[in-house]
A protein has these predicted regions:
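Conserved, well-structured functional cores that handle cations and Mg-NTP chemistry
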Residues: 1-218
Length: 218
């Protein structure tokens, strides 16, 4: 199908395209189109095992773009993807009703492990997992540091907090996980210039374990 037909504003895909355009305002048209198609494939398949998986099961059926185009935009395109977090913060803060503007917002930092069955993946390593259920406290895989924004909203006349993921970054051991988390927090803090109460929560876990021999946080 043509791009014009696919992005018709009267269709669900067209409305999704309009919504995500705010994330791609500074990108070239081809790059923005490729990134949106990737997002659309993830939403459709509810999974993202790999770019090849997305291409074989969805993308190849709706676009003439090659698989390499999608690899390129994720790996080599000169795009500052960290700005996506700032855009998400701005959108999320608009969800706070006027009556709750003085309530605190929370930035929650955590880490998560993703196991890998191979050993030749980039940055894969043996990681300590305090929540492992495989008979060992270690797994072979990747570690990601995440930041989530929680904002107050009304839910049946009670204050409830809506949780919105802002971003994930792979820990590559070039810096500590806390330093990685701090860089993500610094990235989004300018968006909170109008907020007086911002609470940063660090989820206790492997992210903040001490190396006994080195006496420092890892």
């Amino acid at each position: 199908c043509t791009t014009k037909t696919l992005y018709n504003e009267k269709t669900l895909i067209g409305r999704l395209h309009q919504y995500f355009l705010i994330y791609f305002e500074t990108f070239s048209v081809p790059t923005a189109d490729t990134l949106f198609l990737l997002i659309l494939s993830i939403l459709t398949l509810e999974s993202a095992h790999s770019i090849r998986f997305l291409y074989q099961h969805f993308l190849s059926g709706i676009t003439e773009k090659s698989l390499n185009v999608f690899y390129y935009v994720c790996s080599y395109a000169k795009v500052d993807y960290s700005r996506f977090m700032n855009t998400t913060v701005r959108i999320t803060l608009k969800l706070i009703p006027d009556s709750l503007q003085t309530q605190p917002v929370f930035l929650c930092v955590d880490d998560t492990m993703v196991s890998k069955f191979g050993t030749k993946f980039e940055n894969v390593s043996k990681l300590f997992d305090h929540a492992a259920h495989n008979g060992s406290n270690y797994l072979n895989g990747h570690c990601f540091v995440s930041v989530m924004l929680c904002v107050p909203v009304w839910n049946r006349d009670k204050v409830s907090y809506l949780s919105v993921p802002l971003g994930y970054r792979m820990w590559q051991k070039k810096e500590s996980k806390l330093e990685l988390a701090a860089s993500m927090i610094r990235q989004v803090m300018p968006e909170f210039h109008s907020k007086d109460h911002i609470i940063i929560l660090l989820m206790v876990g492997a992210l903040y374990c001490y190396r006994k021999n080195e006496n420092k946080i890892v």
